[in-house]
Every structure is written in structure tokens, then in C-alpha cells.
Amino acid sequence: MGYSYNPKSLCADEFINDEEILETLAFADAHKNDVQMCYDILEKCKPHLHPASEHGAMITHREASVLLACEDAGVNEAIKQLAHDIKQAYYGNRIVLFAPLYLSNYCVNSCLYCPYHAKNREIPRRKLTQDEIRAEVIALQDMGHKRLAIEAGEDPKHNPIEYILESMDTIYSIKHKNGAIRRVNVNIAATTVDEYRMLKKAEIGTYILFQETYNKEGYKRLHPTGPKSDYNWHTEAMDRAMEGGIDDVGLGVLFGLESYRYEFAGLIMHAEHLEAVHGVGPHTISVPRVKPAMDIDPDVFDNGIPDEMFEKIIALIRITVPYTGMIISTRESQTVRERALRYGISQISGGSRTSVGGYTEQARPHDTEQFDVSDQRTLDDVVSWLIDQEHVPSFCTACYRAGRTGDRFMSFCKSGQILNYCHPNALVTLAEYLTDYAKPDTSQKGFALIERELQKVEDEKRRRQCAEAISAVVHKGERDLRF
């Protein structure tokens, strides 16, 4: 059966259409040396430098693919500069911090790139009890984390939806000293509309599901057995999640599995599809790369991308989907993460453990890790590093709890109004962290940064309110103040 490209369709074969992607790549090859076309495409993006006063059209997946294929040094430098400037216009210098929490590595799937695959007899299988989850969360709160992304393999017997829901309730219930987890994002396998409704009722933050690869034939090869082997079921999951009432969804591909140009086009088409059908694009886009792990050698995948191209992909996602939050994890090294922050990344993990029960172990356990962690710094080290670069480490979760989600969040973000909330909230939550958890030198330079950043809050009333909230945090012990 032949399929035609239709971004408004609910059929994965139509909104991620193979023929359209191949035609897109051919178009990009035909025009990659047309420097004037490339600059004209970049010019279309410039209204996004002023989101409060101008509403520029998004460039298409074809136009973005031309830019990706372009090898002209001047164009590539212009791409990075524009991406930096657009990120500043939408998100400023704030960097949201989070941590993953692995609940269970039981899995019935056979993904060839993941050590949790069912045939791996070497990995110890483990599932956290609710008491163990409490201990993990207390350890995370004692670091200073306020936002978690929970992860679990797909296993109806060991990890049913009831286990995920109970775990979310446990996480939200824990208030240790001044600690609290205020937003729980969920990264679990594609499921039904009814189960998405249950996650919504349990106060999910963002539902995250990595596509892994948009190449259907490659997807089938990489997922030979298990529920995840159904490409359409997996690819159409975000539509079911939004039908189930989940406002915020997060996309991502695992770069290195298939051609990065194919994946990039598919990722942008998925974002276009969500906009076309639901009026709301992805709340976040993640950019993981295949990394070593037990039973996994990334060198067997011959589509790896060098750091320079990886940075260009990040920059082009920022230009093409300017409103989205962009996430990079501790899969990447400090050096790569530092450069990625310039070109579009707005969220990073810190102090992460990618093993089940990893936060309460004295020594870092490697035998249950999903992937090797490249950036092994503590959360305080990451916060200190961000401050040194004049980034504002943010632990804010205010939008989610104030109802600024889905189309409401997007209207604030696309108009630039979100800056009136996010910047002050970032400063208040940073003050919480510096008061409760930071090392003395981190605290000292962090409060100096807050003083400098307060002067950048343009609205005089909001600047005064922000200063008062910070004072209440530091001197009165108040917590969870937000705008």
C-alpha cells in the first residue's frame, strides 16, 4: 500500500512519510551549495529573535534539511550564531536542571542498542520497592533536585501502569527537610489512551518517548521482538498521549542508529505534525547519541556523528523549533555539553545515575546502568560550572503547577512573555538551592550572579517582587515561592 505525506494524518506512515523524507534529502543535496538560498532560509527565521513583537513562520523540514546539508563555512557559522540568539530570545540564559530516576530494568523488548533487552542474561534485573524509591528520592532531594524524569523498561508483569502511578505518588509525597520533587516527567513505553489518562490524573509533567529512529525499515531491524517492535504503535504514541489529556510531550531520536539526515528530517516532521493536529508542538526535544553500555558497543552502529555535526543539529533544531525546550544528558561529556548550551540546549541533567538504585549506593553501580555516564560531576559541580559561564541554574517547576502547560505554555513562550515568569522563578529557585545545598564557594558566586541578574528583570514591579521572594527564601526560610 502506498502512502502520501500528510502532516495532519494520524497514521505514522503519512505524517512521517518515507517518500517525503527521501525527496527532502534529494532536495537538500540539490541545493546544499546554493549559498544564497541558505541565507534566505536563515532570514525567514530572524523574526524569532523578537518573539514579543513579531511572529515569524517556522521554516519547513525541507528548508532545515538544506541548511543541514550545506557545507559553506559562512552559512554554518551564521546557523550557530542565529541559534544562540534565538535561544536567548526565548529562554535567556537559564538552564533547567533535572535528574533521571531509574525504577526498573525489567524489559520484554529486544532493542539492539539497549542493555536492558530481554536476551541480556548478564545484567542483574532489579525493580525498586516503594521504600527504595523513597530512599532514592531523599538522596536526590539532598542534592537539591526538584525535577525528575522517571524511567522504566517495558514489562507488563514487573512494571505495569499501576506500579508507575504508585511510584509517582510516592515521589510527590516525600518532603525531606526543605526538599520536594515538584515535577515528575515520565519516560515509559508507548501505551493506551486510557493509561495516558491515568498518568494525567497522577499529575505527570512531560511524557517523554524517544522515537529511537524514524526509518521504518531500520526500526524493524533494531526492534526484532516485543511490543516496541510495532513501529506505528510507537510512532503514534504522542497523539494518543495528547488525546488522553497530557499537555506536554517530549520527542527525541537516538542519533547514531540510522542516517542523521533522515532522523533530523523525521524529527522536524514529527514536530510539524503535532503542531498541525494539536496546535501544540513538542514541549521538549532530546538529542541523545548511542553510547557504550553492558552488552552494547556503539561502534557496531556505523551512523555515528562527530561532535561538530552534533552541534549543528542542535543549532538547527533550535532554529526550526524555536519554542521547544532542548535536553542533553550526561551521556555527553562536559566539553560537548558546554558547547551545546551555546547553540540551543535549555535543560541538562546533573549528578545523574543511570542504574536502578544508583543514588543510594556508596559506589557508583555499573552493572545495571542503561548507558555509560560521560559527565560524572556532582550536581553542585554542575551548578558551579553553569554560574561560571553566566548561565542561571534553574530548578523552576512553576509553569506546570500554575497551569501554563500545552497550548497555554506555547502561547506564553511563542510571544516571549514566558521570560516575565521564568527568569524571576529561576532566580528564586536558585536562591533555594544556594541556601539549602550549595558548597560555600558555589553559594557565594551564585548570590553574586543573582544580584546581577535581578537588574535584568525589566518590569520594576516584578523585579521588586522577585527581590522580596529571594529575601524571604534566605532570611525567613520560606520555600516554593513562584510567579
Pin down the residues of each PLM region.
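An N-cap/entry alpha-helix motif that binds or orients negatively charged groups
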Residues: 50, 54-95
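Canonical Radical SAM [4Fe-4S] cluster-binding loop centered on the CxxxCxxC motif
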Residues: 91-92, 96-132
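Generic structural signal for well-ordered alpha-helices
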Residues: 99, 137, 165-172, 196, ...
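Core AdoMet radical
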Residues: 118-134, 139-242, 247-257, 279-286, ...
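Conserved C-terminal portion of the radical SAM core fold
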Residues: 152, 206, 232-296, 306-335, ...
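Short glycine-enriched, charge-decorated loop/helix-capping segments at active-site entrances
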Residues: 222-228, 299-303, 368
